[in-house]
Amino acid sequence: MLVDAGFNDLMRPAMYGSYHHISALAAEGRSLEHAPTVETVVAGPLCESGDVFTQQEGGNVETRALPEVKAGDYLVLHDTGAYGASMSSNYNSRPLLPEVLFDNGQARLIRRRQTIEELLALELL
């Protein structure tokens, strides 16, 4: 499954195979709780073979049992910690992603998405 995020947003799986639990959320509120699961490789849109979130140290790709999702649904990569933001970059001219903190079950936006204007503001030519 290809997702909007890439290793420029979360470098740790590509660097050293860090494991992050992945769960799915349906966009329009349908329940995925009892949906059948499919063995899934989760990868990003970058033009690099290492842009895979479900890999072990050394680059061995693994699958995760995830419910079938549709375009527009969300995947949550859990436990990314403080290093997600500090290790992220604008590689391939991609804006920085927003970050959400789950605090006692409540989602809180702690970093908004970078705009294209902000991304290009440092360019001189």
Predicted regions mapped to residue ranges:
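Charged (often Lys/Glu-rich) extended helix/loop segments that serve as interaction or gating elements
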Residues: M1-L125
